[in-house]
Amino acid sequence: SIPQNCLPYISMVLHTCNQNHFYHDAVFFTLFTNKKKGLCMIQLEHISKKFKKKAVLNDISYTFEAGKIYGIYGINGSGKTMLLRIISGLVFPTSGSIIINGKTLHKEISFPDHMGLIIENMELQPQLTAFENLEELNKINHYATTSDIQDALRKINLQSNEKVKKFSLGMKQKLNIAQAIFENPQLLLLDEPTNALDTDTIGCLKAILEDLKKKNCCIIIATHDHQNITSLCDRILEMKEGNLYDKN
């Protein structure tokens, strides 16, 4: 179900994972981005997803607009992560359409080139510094400058010259966030971004998201952490048993 024009990039990422044998619980990886200042609007039209006879998502219709932060909360298994995978184009819906800036993804089999994408169990390279980890990711598309990398690490308050093998879980999570933002995506999808973060770092994350919002980035966060998501997001949605409810 992965779009063909996405496969070379996925292959490079997976090759890096296999070479280093070091995995982390979650990563927020900017797979495709560009420097164009276009707006990103996502329209979900009657999205349903089934595995065999089990319904995972039920007839979801919603529009996500540029320049806003959306929070989707729900318990494990509610369907929130599956919805993010479908929006990213890595999984196609059983029925319905995903339209990004007027292009229907599952019909045209095109992959957005301005997306910060979640990849579960993506590795960090322990023998490298935080800066070097971002440099390695930048080799995939070469959109970021040295200044972009340094700025992302500064915003999340992470030392650029310390090796990842010395990192605590919270520091690794900080690096995951830096990986998501250093190429300035127009669409950013985050799964459980506040995991292992202290209060100060959650404050840094909020400032980062507010900055991206001012640049008209469309940000969608999936989490079970209702308390922190309320302070981070403009609009709150609840995912329950495959149904999406607007709580505003």
Model regions and ranges:
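Conserved ABC transporter NBD signature motif
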Residues: 96-111
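H-loop/switch region of ABC-family ATPase nucleotide-binding domains
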Residues: 223-224
